[in-house]
Curated annotation (Swiss-Prot):
Binding site for substrate: Q19, H122, N166
Keywords, in A-Z order: Glycoprotein, Glycosidase, Hydrolase, Metal-binding, Zinc
Assembly and oligomerization: Homodimer.
Organism: Brevicoryne brassicae (Mealy cabbage aphid)
Name the UniProt record assigns to this protein: Myrosinase 1
Enzyme Commission code: 3.2.1.147
Chain segments annotated as coiled-coil in the UniProt record: none
Tissue specificity comment: Expressed in the skeletal muscle tissues surrounding the head, abdomen and thorax. Not expressed in flight muscles (at protein level).
Length: 464
């Protein structure tokens, strides 16, 4: 196989505001749900750390842009901190210094011929809005719409690529299994309500842009949908094949189906309705869209934005320790062949899973333009990060195979991440960066890893 990425293929890298910026209470920034969580419950973070300073990108953004420029990347995906723009999250009180920070970052990128790709929401809800109920409160979709309006107004003349939500399924986990902020345990219904509100919010932001801003700004909008890819444990078993399809619909059809087809996947509605009845509930745990909401949502992705890291095998059953959603009735496992002896890495590399996922998405949604908005490997932080290089090489080759052999319409690839950063409940114990950050140094010194050199070469040659 000697495939090569086309000349117009978009290579980029990705970060998120809470994970890299620091400056948690500087220049009028308000408190968000991660600030509140790490300050009141530091024990939930593996190493007891927080994102108060993180990579200090609030002060060192020019250094970050210089690194991106050196990599010759086409774009940089970063997220905006809602509470930096509007401290309470309500748009009647904006913070000019927060707006200035993002204007400076965007202008610095453009000055260096780097396209800004902006994520509006990467998990850091202003605490005041959480006090109102957060994403389980339907009113949040209107707050988000007004937040989006401000972003389009202030930045849309230069930003032409937007992501409304990063991995909405992860936000849902924060309401049901205490895996992310706000760290709530609203089992059975919390995650479905949070997902529903995010979808409506996405639809409202998309339609607002379409009607008010797209005619002059001419940008694109999507939503980054994540998840492992599920494959049948026994490829000969009809039960396992059916279970894998159901698991994939619960994992990513949950958000992809409404955005492309207007409603939740039929199999998801059927199973949640049935489980709700079995639990003696008077209605389904999965909210229903109105006809107007179906119309609002259908066709609200200008490209498919995919975050993907790993895959799992599934078989039918009730998992005694369900990772997240017991309503889907599947048990996950890994193929021993995926692992090295005596090793269970944080990310289990299954590159063929990405290829199969790209084919699945092509068949499911009519082969849309697809941008991989996150893919990467976390390790112990060594500079000679050859495991990360191996992971990237294999996943890039799987992407090429999907493009050339399966005719999947992949337009770009984003490596997670540019920098080591605050990896949520793992703190600083896992390192995804092409660039190492010394978190013990007040200067947060940046040092390029072997994977940096590797990825720079891929970008320049088009070959993994």
């Amino acid at each position: 196989m000697d495939y090569k990425f086309p000349k117009d293929f978009m290579f980029g890298t990705s970060t998120a505001s809470y994970q890299i910026e620091g400056g948690w209470n500087e220049d009028g920034k308000g408190e968000n749900i991660w600030d509140r969580l790490v300050h009141t419950s530091p024990e939930v973070i593996k190493d007891g750390t927080n994102g108060d300073i993180a990579c200090d990108s609030y002060h060192k953004y020019k250094e970050d842009v210089a690194i991106i420029k050196d990599l010759n990347l086409k774009f940089y995906r970063f997220s905006i901190s809602w509470a930096r723009i509007a401290p309470s999250g309500v748009m009647n009180s904006l913070e000019p210094k927060g707006i200035a920070y993002y204007n400076n970052l965007i202008n610095e990128l453009i000055k260096n011929d780097i396209i800004p790709l902006v994520t509006m929401y990467h998990w850091d809800l202003p605490q005041y809005l959480q006090d109102l109920g957060g994403w389980v409160n339907p009113i949040m979709s209107d707050y988000f719409k007004e937040y989006a309006r401000v972003l389009f107004t202030y930045f849309g003349d230069r930003v032409k690529w937007w992501i409304t939500f990063n991995e909405p399924i992860a936000v849902c986990k924060g309401y049901s299994i205490k895996a992310y902020a706000p760290n709530l345990n609203l089992k059975t219904t919390g995650h479905y309500l949070a997902g529903h509100t995010q979808l409506i919010a996405h639809g409202k932001a998309y339609r607002l842009y379409e009607e008010m801003f797209k005619p002059t700004q001419n940008g694109k909008i999507s939503i980054s949908i994540s998840g492992v890819f599920f494959m049948p444990k026994n490829a000969e078993s009809d039960d396992d094949i059916e279970t894998a399809e159901r698991a994939n619909q619960f994992e990513r059809g949950w958000f992809g189906h409404p955005v492309y087809k207007g409603d939740y996947p039929p199999i998801m509605k059927k199973w949640v309705d049935q489980k709700s009845k079995e639990e003696g509930l008077p209605w389904s745990k999965l909210p229903k869209f109105t006809k107007d909401e179906i119309k609002l949502l259908k066709g609200t992705a200008d490209f498919y934005a995919l975050n993907h890291y790993s895959s799992r095998l599934v078989t039918f059953g009730s998992d005694p320790n369900p990772n997240f959603n017991p309503d889907a009735s599947y048990v996950t496992s890994v193929d021993e062949a995926w692992l090295k002896p005596n090793e269970t890495p944080y990310i289990i590399p299954v590159p063929e899973g990405l290829r199969k996922l790209l084919i699945w998405l092509k068949n499911e949604y009519g082969n849309p333009q697809l941008l991989i908005t996150e893919n990467g490997y976390g390790d112990d932080g060594q500079l000679d990060d050859f495991e990360k290089i191996s992971y990237l090489k294999n996943y890039l080759n799987a992407t090429l195979q999907a493009m050339y052999e399966d005719k999947c319409n992949v337009i770009g690839y984003t490596v997670w991440s540019l920098l080591d950063n605050f990896e949520w409940f793992y703190g600083y114990s896992i390192h995804f960066g092409l660039v190492k950050i010394d978190f013990n140094d007040p200067q947060r010194t940046r040092t390029k890893r072997e994977s940096y050199t590797y990825f720079k070469n891929v970008v320049s040659t088009g070959k993994p």
